[in-house]
């Protein structure tokens, strides 16, 4: 790879996009590249990035129906003329071009949908000479990711790559998810019989501790013989509430997700995001339950449609899925094997591969 210089465009919206950017940067540096990470929210006019983050966090937490409506209007797949993020992307134009002039990259890699809109617009207008290879972090490739000005799309699944290719006319490849190597290292062969005691089941709420009826779900699982381990992110209030559930473990933000995955028997997930793909790498089955609105729900459905998770529609469905996936046998083994097989290629290699 020599002296290739790569500017990665992530976003401080939760922790997932930056985690992907960071892991891609690590892989690229290992291949001899120079990298720089940029939070795309800092390219927006002063105050806009924090306001956008606060609005998204607030609506997902307190007004999920409103966020679902916004997603349906601006981002959900489908034909027809609808408003998009072009006006917002235009406001980042000058600042991104300044970053490009300062760092002099040979390649831009957006890992957040707004960043993909910014680079796509600038490439289409001919003012950005540096190619842009987009890494799509979502299982459901929504409209926000898609712009024909970008040079390449690297996606999590073949279905995602086909959607990107059909919508943009640009090349699209499949790598599978991007996770740090420690998650693969904890994926050693699981014992045929579970350890004594209630099986530990992780409940994920992301970096912000966002979810619906999370504590109620923990009580339900505890009442049916599980040991719920609630990942409350940075929401201390949620952690305190969850800690009062008999038999449950409530954790705040942790830097040892790989260790938790190595000890878990199952992940109950609500976003089909980075925690879910970390579970795939670690050999932990994923069960989608009460996913976040908008891209969370679409992503959970797409992940399940790809055979990488189980989608529960109601409490009875949840408990039945938990029983099937905790029990040693072909159902659990098949889902674990499909999850591990999702990692089909090195995204860093695909993103930097010369055209043709």
Give residue ranges: language-model regions.
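Conserved N-terminal ligand/cofactor-binding loop architecture of enzyme catalytic domains
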Residues: 23-99
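A nucleotide-sugar donor-handling region in carbohydrate enzymes
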Residues: 149-207, 232-237
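Donor-nucleotide binding loops and adjacent catalytic segments primarily
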Residues: 189, 194-264
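A donor-sugar binding/catalytic signature common to diverse glycosyltransferases
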Residues: 257-298
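Conserved donor-nucleotide binding/catalytic region of nucleotide-linked donor-dependent transferases
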Residues: 315, 321-339
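C-terminal alpha-helical cap of glycosyltransferases
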Residues: 337-356
């Amino acid at each position: 790879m020599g002296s290739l210089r790569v500017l990665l465009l992530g976003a401080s919206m939760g922790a997932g996009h930056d985690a992907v950017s960071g892991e891609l940067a690590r892989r690229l540096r290992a291949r001899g590249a120079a990298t720089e990470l940029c939070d795309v929210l800092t390219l927006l006019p002063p105050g806009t990035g924090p306001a956008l983050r606060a609005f998204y966090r607030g609506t997902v937490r307190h007004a999920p129906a409103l966020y679902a409506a916004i997603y349906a209007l601006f981002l959900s797949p489908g034909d027809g003329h609808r408003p998009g993020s072009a006006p917002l992307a235009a406001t980042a134009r000058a600042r991104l071009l300044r970053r490009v002039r300062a760092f002099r990259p040979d390649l831009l890699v957006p890992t957040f949908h707004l960043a993909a809109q910014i680079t796509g617009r600038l490439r289409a207008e001919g003012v950005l000479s540096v190619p842009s290879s987009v890494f799509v972090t979502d299982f459901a490739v929504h409209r926000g990711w898609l712009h024909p000005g970008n040079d390449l799309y690297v996606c999590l699944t073949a279905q995602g790559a086909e959607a990107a290719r059909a919508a943009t006319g640009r090349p699209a490849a499949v790598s599978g998810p991007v996770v740090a190597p420690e998650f693969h290292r904890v994926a050693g062969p699981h014992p045929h019989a579970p350890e004594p005691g209630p099986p530990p089941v992780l409940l994920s709420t992301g970096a912000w501790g966002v979810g619906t009826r999370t504590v109620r779900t923990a009580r339900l699982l505890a009442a049916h013989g599980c040991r719920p381990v609630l990942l409350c992110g940075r929401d201390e209030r949620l952690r305190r509430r969850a800690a009062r559930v008999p038999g449950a473990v409530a954790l705040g933000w942790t830097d040892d997700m790989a260790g938790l995955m190595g000890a878990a028997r199952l992940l109950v997930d609500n976003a089909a995001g980075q925690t879910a793909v970390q579970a795939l790498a670690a050999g932990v089955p994923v069960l989608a339950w009460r996913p976040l609105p908008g891209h969370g729900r679409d992503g959970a459905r797409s992940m399940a449609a790809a055979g990488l998770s189980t989608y529960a529609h109601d409490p009875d469905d949840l408990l039945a899925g938990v029983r099937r996936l905790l029990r040693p046998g072909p159902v659990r083994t098949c889902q674990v094997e499909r999850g591990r097989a999702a990692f089909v290629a090195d995204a860093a290699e695909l993103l930097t591969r010369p055209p043709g």
